[in-house]
Amino acid sequence: MSNLRIPGIAHVLAGASGKGGVGKTTVAVNLALALHQDGVRVGLFDADLHGPNIQLMLGIPPKSSTGKPLNIPVVRSAPRPYIPPLERFGLKSMSLGLLVGDTDTILADGPLAGRMICRTLQDVVWGELDVLLLDFPPGTGEPQRTLLNTIHFDGVLLVTTPQDLSLMDTSRSVGLFRQTGVPILGVVENMSFLYCPHCGEPIEVFARSQREWAITDAAFEQLGRIPLHMSLSRGIETGHPLLHTIPDSPEALAFRRLAAEVSRKVGLSPGKPPRRDR
Protein backbone atom coordinates (compact mmCIF):
# COMPACT_ATOMS: atom_id res chain seq x y z
CA MET A 1 0.00 0.00 0.00
CA SER A 2 1.40 3.39 -0.99
CA ASN A 3 1.95 6.13 1.55
CA LEU A 4 -0.56 8.92 2.02
CA ARG A 5 -0.33 12.01 -0.18
CA ILE A 6 -1.65 15.20 1.41
CA PRO A 7 -4.23 16.84 -0.88
CA GLY A 8 -3.23 20.18 -2.39
CA ILE A 9 0.47 19.84 -1.63
CA ALA A 10 2.83 19.33 -4.56
CA HIS A 11 5.97 18.33 -2.65
CA VAL A 12 6.46 17.13 0.92
CA LEU A 13 10.05 17.43 2.13
CA ALA A 14 11.72 16.51 5.42
CA GLY A 15 14.55 18.30 7.19
CA ALA A 16 16.33 15.74 9.34
CA SER A 17 19.47 15.17 11.37
CA GLY A 18 21.10 12.24 13.09
CA LYS A 19 21.47 14.16 16.34
CA GLY A 20 20.23 17.28 18.05
CA GLY A 21 22.13 20.54 18.30
CA VAL A 22 23.10 20.92 14.64
CA GLY A 23 20.68 23.78 13.96
CA LYS A 24 18.20 21.78 11.91
CA THR A 25 15.19 23.89 12.91
CA THR A 26 17.06 27.13 12.25
CA VAL A 27 17.87 25.82 8.78
CA ALA A 28 14.26 24.74 8.20
CA VAL A 29 12.79 28.13 9.17
CA ASN A 30 15.21 30.19 7.10
CA LEU A 31 15.05 27.82 4.12
CA ALA A 32 11.25 28.06 4.16
CA LEU A 33 11.50 31.86 4.18
CA ALA A 34 14.03 31.84 1.33
CA LEU A 35 11.71 29.67 -0.76
CA HIS A 36 8.76 31.93 0.04
CA GLN A 37 10.72 35.01 -0.99
CA ASP A 38 11.38 33.27 -4.32
CA GLY A 39 7.64 33.01 -4.91
CA VAL A 40 7.16 29.42 -3.70
CA ARG A 41 4.03 28.66 -1.65
CA VAL A 42 5.47 27.13 1.51
CA GLY A 43 4.13 25.44 4.61
CA LEU A 44 6.21 24.53 7.66
CA PHE A 45 5.28 21.75 10.10
CA ASP A 46 7.08 21.10 13.36
CA ALA A 47 7.10 17.31 13.79
CA ASP A 48 9.10 17.34 17.02
CA LEU A 49 6.50 16.19 19.53
CA HIS A 50 8.65 16.54 22.64
CA GLY A 51 10.57 19.70 21.76
CA PRO A 52 8.49 21.82 19.36
CA ASN A 53 9.86 25.33 18.89
CA ILE A 54 9.19 26.50 15.35
CA GLN A 55 6.38 28.69 16.65
CA LEU A 56 8.84 30.48 18.94
CA MET A 57 11.34 30.98 16.12
CA LEU A 58 8.58 32.61 14.08
CA GLY A 59 7.53 34.84 16.97
CA ILE A 60 4.15 33.15 17.49
CA PRO A 61 3.08 33.31 21.16
CA PRO A 62 2.70 29.91 22.87
CA LYS A 63 -0.36 28.72 24.73
CA SER A 64 -0.41 28.98 28.50
CA SER A 65 0.79 25.88 30.29
CA THR A 66 -1.55 23.70 32.33
CA GLY A 67 1.33 22.60 34.55
CA LYS A 68 0.34 18.95 34.11
CA PRO A 69 1.60 16.18 31.80
CA LEU A 70 -0.75 15.62 28.87
CA ASN A 71 -1.71 12.08 27.91
CA ILE A 72 -3.24 12.77 24.50
CA PRO A 73 -4.94 9.87 22.72
CA VAL A 74 -4.87 9.51 18.96
CA VAL A 75 -8.43 10.19 17.92
CA ARG A 76 -10.21 8.84 14.88
CA SER A 77 -9.59 10.72 11.66
CA ALA A 78 -11.74 13.81 11.21
CA PRO A 79 -14.06 13.91 8.15
CA ARG A 80 -11.99 16.79 6.78
CA PRO A 81 -9.07 19.00 7.89
CA TYR A 82 -10.17 21.50 10.51
CA ILE A 83 -7.07 23.05 12.14
CA PRO A 84 -6.23 26.44 10.58
CA PRO A 85 -2.49 27.00 10.13
CA LEU A 86 -0.98 30.18 11.48
CA GLU A 87 0.57 32.57 8.97
CA ARG A 88 3.68 34.55 9.75
CA PHE A 89 6.11 36.18 7.32
CA GLY A 90 4.10 34.64 4.48
CA LEU A 91 4.53 31.06 5.72
CA LYS A 92 1.72 28.73 6.71
CA SER A 93 2.89 26.92 9.81
CA MET A 94 1.73 24.47 12.42
CA SER A 95 3.56 23.17 15.45
CA LEU A 96 2.48 20.76 18.11
CA GLY A 97 3.74 23.47 20.43
CA LEU A 98 0.72 25.55 19.39
CA LEU A 99 -1.71 22.87 20.58
CA VAL A 100 -0.31 22.50 24.10
CA GLY A 101 1.16 24.84 26.70
CA ASP A 102 4.72 26.10 26.39
CA THR A 103 5.98 23.93 29.28
CA ASP A 104 3.51 21.02 29.06
CA THR A 105 4.91 17.51 28.70
CA ILE A 106 3.22 15.22 26.17
CA LEU A 107 3.04 11.60 27.29
CA ALA A 108 3.26 9.78 23.98
CA ASP A 109 6.12 7.55 22.86
CA GLY A 110 6.97 5.12 20.11
CA PRO A 111 4.47 4.49 17.30
CA LEU A 112 1.77 6.32 19.28
CA ALA A 113 3.79 9.53 18.99
CA GLY A 114 4.20 8.97 15.26
CA ARG A 115 0.48 8.39 14.76
CA MET A 116 -0.32 11.54 16.73
CA ILE A 117 2.01 13.62 14.55
CA CYS A 118 0.57 12.12 11.35
CA ARG A 119 -2.98 12.78 12.52
CA THR A 120 -2.21 16.42 13.35
CA LEU A 121 -0.46 16.91 10.02
CA GLN A 122 -3.49 15.63 8.11
CA ASP A 123 -5.95 17.70 10.14
CA VAL A 124 -4.39 21.03 9.15
CA VAL A 125 -6.16 23.06 6.44
CA TRP A 126 -3.04 23.63 4.33
CA GLY A 127 -4.73 24.68 1.11
CA GLU A 128 -2.62 24.74 -2.06
CA LEU A 129 1.13 24.59 -1.43
CA ASP A 130 4.16 24.03 -3.63
CA VAL A 131 6.19 22.71 -0.69
CA LEU A 132 5.42 21.47 2.80
CA LEU A 133 8.61 21.23 4.85
CA LEU A 134 8.53 18.97 7.91
CA ASP A 135 11.08 19.66 10.62
CA PHE A 136 11.79 16.15 11.91
CA PRO A 137 12.78 15.30 15.47
CA PRO A 138 16.48 14.34 15.70
CA GLY A 139 17.53 10.71 15.57
CA THR A 140 16.51 7.59 13.67
CA GLY A 141 13.92 5.82 15.82
CA GLU A 142 10.32 6.68 16.57
CA PRO A 143 8.33 8.69 15.64
CA GLN A 144 10.44 9.09 12.49
CA ARG A 145 9.77 5.59 11.20
CA THR A 146 6.01 5.89 11.61
CA LEU A 147 6.04 9.22 9.75
CA LEU A 148 8.10 7.80 6.89
CA ASN A 149 5.91 4.70 6.64
CA THR A 150 2.66 6.71 6.65
CA ILE A 151 3.21 9.95 4.72
CA HIS A 152 4.55 10.20 1.17
CA PHE A 153 7.79 12.21 1.14
CA ASP A 154 9.36 13.55 -2.04
CA GLY A 155 12.78 13.98 -0.46
CA VAL A 156 14.83 14.71 2.63
CA LEU A 157 17.57 17.20 3.42
CA LEU A 158 20.12 15.96 5.94
CA VAL A 159 21.47 18.73 8.19
CA THR A 160 24.89 18.23 9.73
CA THR A 161 27.90 20.13 11.03
CA PRO A 162 31.54 19.64 9.95
CA GLN A 163 32.63 17.45 12.90
CA ASP A 164 33.19 13.70 12.95
CA LEU A 165 30.41 12.88 15.42
CA SER A 166 27.80 14.78 13.46
CA LEU A 167 28.79 13.08 10.22
CA MET A 168 28.72 9.66 11.87
CA ASP A 169 25.17 10.30 13.05
CA THR A 170 24.27 11.55 9.57
CA SER A 171 25.32 8.18 8.15
CA ARG A 172 22.81 6.48 10.45
CA SER A 173 20.07 8.72 9.09
CA VAL A 174 21.09 7.69 5.58
CA GLY A 175 20.24 4.09 6.44
CA LEU A 176 16.80 5.04 7.76
CA PHE A 177 15.78 6.95 4.65
CA ARG A 178 17.14 4.29 2.32
CA GLN A 179 15.15 1.62 4.15
CA THR A 180 11.94 3.60 3.75
CA GLY A 181 12.59 4.57 0.13
CA VAL A 182 12.69 8.34 0.64
CA PRO A 183 15.06 10.11 -1.80
CA ILE A 184 17.95 11.94 -0.14
CA LEU A 185 18.19 15.30 -1.87
CA GLY A 186 21.55 16.11 -0.29
CA VAL A 187 23.36 17.41 2.75
CA VAL A 188 23.30 20.87 4.31
CA GLU A 189 26.40 21.70 6.34
CA ASN A 190 25.36 24.13 9.05
CA MET A 191 27.76 26.21 11.19
CA SER A 192 30.25 25.54 8.42
CA PHE A 193 32.40 28.67 8.81
CA LEU A 194 32.16 32.35 9.67
CA TYR A 195 33.09 35.44 7.71
CA CYS A 196 35.96 37.46 9.14
CA PRO A 197 34.47 40.79 10.31
CA HIS A 198 37.60 42.63 9.09
CA CYS A 199 38.43 41.16 5.69
CA GLY A 200 35.30 39.16 4.87
CA GLU A 201 37.21 35.94 4.21
CA PRO A 202 35.65 32.66 5.43
CA ILE A 203 37.17 31.17 8.59
CA GLU A 204 36.55 27.55 9.57
CA VAL A 205 36.13 27.67 13.34
CA PHE A 206 35.50 23.96 13.88
CA ALA A 207 37.94 21.18 13.07
CA ARG A 208 36.78 19.76 9.77
CA SER A 209 36.05 16.05 9.78
CA GLN A 210 38.39 13.66 8.03
CA ARG A 211 35.37 11.45 7.38
CA GLU A 212 33.80 13.32 4.50
CA TRP A 213 32.64 9.89 3.31
CA ALA A 214 29.27 10.67 4.86
CA ILE A 215 28.78 13.08 1.99
CA THR A 216 31.20 12.21 -0.80
CA ASP A 217 31.55 8.42 -0.69
CA ALA A 218 27.79 8.02 -0.47
CA ALA A 219 27.48 10.27 -3.53
CA PHE A 220 25.21 12.76 -1.80
CA GLU A 221 25.37 16.27 -3.08
CA GLN A 222 26.28 19.03 -0.67
CA LEU A 223 23.40 21.42 -1.23
CA GLY A 224 24.80 24.27 0.82
CA ARG A 225 27.14 25.50 3.54
CA ILE A 226 25.56 27.82 6.10
CA PRO A 227 27.90 30.18 7.97
CA LEU A 228 27.84 31.06 11.64
CA HIS A 229 26.71 34.54 12.58
CA MET A 230 25.20 36.18 15.64
CA SER A 231 22.32 37.54 13.55
CA LEU A 232 21.13 33.97 12.93
CA SER A 233 20.86 33.11 16.61
CA ARG A 234 19.54 36.56 17.51
CA GLY A 235 16.79 36.26 14.91
CA ILE A 236 15.74 32.88 16.25
CA GLU A 237 15.74 34.10 19.85
CA THR A 238 13.61 37.16 19.07
CA GLY A 239 11.17 35.48 16.67
CA HIS A 240 12.40 37.56 13.72
CA PRO A 241 14.42 35.19 11.50
CA LEU A 242 17.43 36.38 9.52
CA LEU A 243 15.73 35.96 6.14
CA HIS A 244 13.07 38.42 7.25
CA THR A 245 15.19 41.01 9.03
CA ILE A 246 18.41 41.01 6.96
CA PRO A 247 17.42 39.39 3.64
CA ASP A 248 20.45 40.74 1.74
CA SER A 249 23.17 39.70 4.21
CA PRO A 250 25.88 37.18 3.21
CA GLU A 251 24.30 34.65 5.58
CA ALA A 252 20.89 35.13 3.97
CA LEU A 253 22.52 34.67 0.57
CA ALA A 254 23.67 31.19 1.69
CA PHE A 255 20.04 30.27 2.37
CA ARG A 256 18.98 31.70 -0.99
CA ARG A 257 21.52 29.49 -2.74
CA LEU A 258 20.25 26.52 -0.73
CA ALA A 259 16.66 27.35 -1.73
CA ALA A 260 17.71 27.46 -5.39
CA GLU A 261 19.32 24.02 -5.06
CA VAL A 262 16.23 22.56 -3.41
CA SER A 263 14.02 24.04 -6.14
CA ARG A 264 16.27 22.50 -8.77
CA LYS A 265 16.24 19.11 -7.08
CA VAL A 266 12.46 18.79 -6.82
CA GLY A 267 11.55 20.67 -9.99
CA LEU A 268 9.97 23.75 -8.46
CA SER A 269 9.09 26.69 -10.67
CA PRO A 270 9.24 29.72 -8.38
CA GLY A 271 6.58 32.31 -9.10
CA LYS A 272 6.53 36.03 -8.66
CA PRO A 273 8.36 36.98 -5.43
CA PRO A 274 5.91 38.28 -2.82
CA ARG A 275 6.02 41.68 -1.26
CA ARG A 276 7.94 41.63 1.99
CA ASP A 277 5.77 40.97 5.01
CA ARG A 278 5.96 43.64 7.70
Language-model regions, residue ranges each:
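Short glycine/serine/threonine-rich phosphate/pyrophosphate-binding segments
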Residues: 22-30, 51-55, 136-144, 166-169
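C-terminal boundary of histidine-terminating zinc-finger modules
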Residues: 238-249
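Phosphate-binding/switch loop-helix module in NTP-utilizing enzymes
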Residues: 97-150
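Walker A/P-loop phosphate-binding motif and the immediately C-terminal alpha-helix
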Residues: 11-49, 174
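Residue-level signature of catalytic and energy-coupling elements of molecular machines
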Residues: 9, 20, 46, 54, ...
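Phosphate-binding loop that captures ATP/GTP phosphates
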Residues: 41-103, 114
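Extreme N-terminal, non-catalytic leader segments
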Residues: 1-22, 63, 270-273
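Conserved catalytic-core segment of NTP-binding enzymes
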Residues: 130-235
